[in-house]
């Protein structure tokens, strides 16, 4: 049941373990770049050819306009239509033809550019040609991103009987071992839990793997997964195709490229480290710190009926704002690292499904998550750096859609805001509003603040003795359903 927010008043073949006859496209897809002659192959695997979307020099042919033009078979094109993918994004246009040529790929593109489709479609098409279990492995840095990728694979593979296993930390390992024992076609995993299964789960092997994908590779390495990735690579066959996708090309990513890719082609869509998409409208509001909540409620009221992500800096502030909004009749749900894994996935699913139209989040959701149709991002607390700002506002205006991002700047945030503007290379405009209109909400906001304060205190008192994340403790590493971490989200259902 959808809980809409009210304004505050004042080809259908199935994958079988045998050969499959697939209807090939009538027109052979044109390669984006000419095949590399043996004499032109780089001597070192560290080198790679680069295709820069900004140059427009890699092909004289017009850019493909449909997935069929890229060489994708009809059954997968139909799945794209079901998902509302009307035409390929730039990263998909550049990457898919190369992947269909059986090449390793490094894809560099900003968040929200359609990277999942860029690697999922070629993998599924190859699976249709030569079906086998444990065909592809996708590694992601966070549980939420892994869950999102698995959902995309399942949606794209819905017409071809795809089997996909999601392997995450924080969930039952025995149930995951059972799922792996059923020989899925695609495994989507976080690195730590996958390594646990490779080392401990009897009968589980990836020695016949055909495809490896590392999504958000820069973040995988920023989160110190490097040693775990090294161990995982030892369990994989060297004869495979590898796709590495990243927002940036750091020295760590280059080292990873040398370790696991063979003669890769580099596809670069991003032209600036701090680039945002042209369909994103960015503004700020300069406000007194003491009235942040009132301005927040005013803006949520202005965007009533639209989907909003509100970013805060701390777990406790995320909880407080969610309570504040719910008290005022708005469908808000929190997302932060203090929640159990099931509660975090539940929050994302409720927001995606539309049963909640406001997601209040820490930066756990600021990168990599594909949440479709987010209309507005509100930076209630400014991020600590420009890179995080770009990742936050990238939650809206995705895949060619329009979006709006508004940042709250108080008297204490001026220096930080100027640094963000400098990194963006532009002076953003102030969002137009009338202070008198905002202050009409103040009495109701103050009452809601008192209620939120009382609820937060009760929650902290209830959890404090158990190492509450809200009180700054580490919390418990594990716990059965119904334990303290799940209690934090009890009123979200």
UniProtKB/Swiss-Prot annotation:
**Under the GO molecular function aspect, what terms does this record hold?**
ATP binding; ATP hydrolysis activity; RNA binding; RNA helicase activity
Q: Which residues form the Helicase ATP-binding domain?
A: 96-267
User: What's the catalysed reaction?
Assistant: ATP + H2O = ADP + phosphate + H(+)
Composition bias, Basic and acidic residues:
484-493
Give the main location: nucleus
Tell me the enzyme class. Answer: hydrolase
Instruction: Report the locations given in the UniProt record.
Output: Nucleus
| Pfam families recorded | DEAD, Helicase_C
Helicase C-terminal domain location: 291-439
EC number(s) per entry: 3.6.4.13
Sequence motif: Q motif, positions: 65-93
The UniProt entry annotates the motif DEAD box at 215-218
Tell whether ATP-binding is among the UniProt keywords.
yes
Cellular component per GO, a single term: cytosol
Subunit comment: Interacts with the SSU processome.
Q: What does this protein do?
A: ATP-dependent rRNA helicase required for pre-ribosomal RNA processing. Involved in the maturation of the 35S-pre-rRNA and to its cleavage to mature 18S rRNA.
Q: What is known of its domains?
A: The Q motif is unique to and characteristic of the DEAD box family of RNA helicases and controls ATP binding and hydrolysis.
For this entry, the protein name equals ATP-dependent rRNA helicase RRP3
Name the species this protein comes from.
Chaetomium globosum (strain ATCC 6205 / CBS 148.51 / DSM 1962 / NBRC 6347 / NRRL 1970) (Soil fungus)
């Amino acid at each position: 049941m959808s809980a809409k927010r009210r304004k505050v008043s004042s080809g259908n073949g199935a994958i079988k373990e045998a050969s499959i006859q697939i209807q090939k496209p009538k027109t052979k897809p044109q390669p984006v770049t000419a095949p590399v002659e043996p004499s032109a192959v780089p001597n070192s695997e560290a080198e790679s050819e680069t295709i820069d979307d900004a140059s427009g020099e890699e092909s004289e042919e017009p850019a493909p306009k449909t997935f069929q033009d890229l060489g994708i078979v009809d059954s997968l094109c139909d799945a794209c239509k079901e998902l509302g993918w009307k035409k390929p994004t730039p990263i998909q246009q550049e990457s898919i033809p190369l992947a269909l040529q059986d090449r390793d790929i490094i894809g560099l593109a900003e968040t929200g550019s359609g990277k999942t489709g860029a690697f999922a479609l070629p993998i599924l098409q190859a699976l249709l040609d030569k079906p086998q279990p444990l065909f592809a492995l996708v590694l992601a840095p966070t549980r939420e991103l892994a869950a999102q990728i698995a959902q995309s694979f399942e949606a794209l593979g819905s017409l071809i009987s795809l089997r996909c296993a999601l392997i995450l930390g924080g969930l039952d390992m025995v149930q995951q071992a059972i799922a792996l024992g059923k020989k899925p076609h695609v495994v989507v995993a976080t690195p730590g839990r996958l390594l646990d299964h490779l080392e401990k789960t009897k009968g589980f092997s990836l020695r016949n793997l055909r495809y490896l994908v590392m999504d958000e590779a820069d973040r995988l390495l920023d989160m110190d997964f490097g040693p775990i990735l090294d161990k995982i690579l030892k369990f994989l066959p060297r004869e495979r195709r590898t796709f590495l996708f990243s927002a940036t090309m750091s020295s760590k990513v280059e080292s990873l490229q040398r370790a696991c890719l063979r003669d890769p082609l580099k596809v670069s869509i991003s032209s600036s480290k701090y680039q945002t998409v042209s369909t994103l409208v960015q503004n700020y509001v300069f406000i007194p710190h003491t009235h942040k909540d009132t301005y927040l409620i005013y803006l949520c009221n202005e965007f009533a009926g639209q989907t909003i992500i509100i970013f805060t800096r701390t777990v406790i502030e995320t909880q407080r704002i969610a309570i504040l909004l719910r008290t005022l009749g708005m469908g808000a749900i929190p997302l932060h690292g203090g929640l159990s894994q099931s509660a975090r996935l539940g929050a994302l699913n409720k927001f995606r499904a539309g049963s909640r139209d406001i997601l209040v989040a820490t930066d756990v959701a600021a990168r990599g998550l594909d949440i479709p149709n987010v209309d507005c991002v509100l930076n209630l607390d400014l991020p600590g750096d420009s890179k995080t700002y770009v990742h936050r506002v990238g939650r809206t205006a995705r895949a060619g859609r329009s979006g709006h991002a508004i940042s709250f700047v108080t008297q204490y945030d001026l220096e930080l805001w100027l640094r963000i503007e400098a990194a963006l290379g532009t002076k953003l405009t102030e969002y137009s509003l009338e202070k008198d209109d905002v202050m009409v909400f103040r009495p109701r906001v103050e009452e809601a603040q008192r209620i939120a304060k009382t609820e937060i205190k009760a929650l902290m008192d209830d959890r404090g003795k158990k190492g509450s994340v809200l009180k700054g403790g580490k919390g418990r590493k594990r716990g059965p359903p119904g334990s303290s971490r799940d209690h934090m989200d009890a009123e979200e259902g």
